Design a protein with these regions (language model features):
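Class I SAM-dependent methyltransferase SAM/SAH-binding core
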Residues: 1-25, 31
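Short, well-ordered coil/turn elements that cap or connect secondary structure elements
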Residues: 7-10, 65, 98-100
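A short SAM/SAH-binding and catalytic strip from SAM-dependent methyltransferases
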Residues: 30-52, 76
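Conserved class I S-adenosyl-L-methionine
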Residues: 68-99
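Conserved Class I S-adenosyl-L-methionine
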Residues: 104-166
């Protein structure tokens, strides 16, 4: 935020908010980007996930200008070299994005690099918890390259243009 302020640009907004209640005016955004956050609406509200997810997209569409773009970034598997989901909730969410909301999808690798296995274990355990870290470290789902530990990560990128009339 401070870097943007120093550039004297006036066409940007940064805010922390619930995806279901975004504190900005209608039709103000050319692009809405959500990184690793909408999935938590599904995870934390699974008994009513479709209703809550629709609130998110109603809100995104409210703030998006006609012809604008929605870009969603989410995990497609930590500890895997190719996209793979162990989580059934995420599978439902991603299928909903693609089949019901008609988002396009691609995937990229976004691997993590650590100086040694102890550093990898400590940071992964803090961020991802014991189950996933144990799976990665104990099952040796990592690579050693140039004295570094590489943890594979696949990331999904979903996008679509606004359906609002211009």
């Amino acid at each position: 935020k401070e870097k943007l302020k120093k550039k004297s640009l006036k066409n940007w907004t940064v805010a922390a908010a619930d995806n279901r209640f975004i504190p900005v005016k209608n039709n103000m955004a050319h692009t809405v980007i959500s990184g690793w956050s909408i999935s938590y609406i599904v995870q934390w509200n699974f008994h009513i996930w479709e209703k809550e997810l629709n609130k998110v997209f109603d809100e995104i569409n409210r703030i998006l200008q006609p012809g604008g773009t929605i870009l969603i970034i989410e995990t497609l598997g930590t500890g895997y070299k190719t996209p793979f989901l162990r989580d059934e909730k995420l599978k439902l969410y991603y299928a909903y994005l693609e089949k019901e909301l008609l988002f396009n999808r691609t995937s990229i690798r976004t691997d993590y690099e650590f100086g040694n296995i102890d550093e990898a274990d400590r940071i992964l355990r803090f961020f991802f918890g014991d189950n996933l870290t144990d799976y990665i470290i104990k099952e040796k789902n990592y690579m050693e390259e140039n004295n570094h530990i590489i943890i594979p990560e696949c990331t999904g990128i979903w996008w679509k243009n606004s359906e609002k009339a211009t």
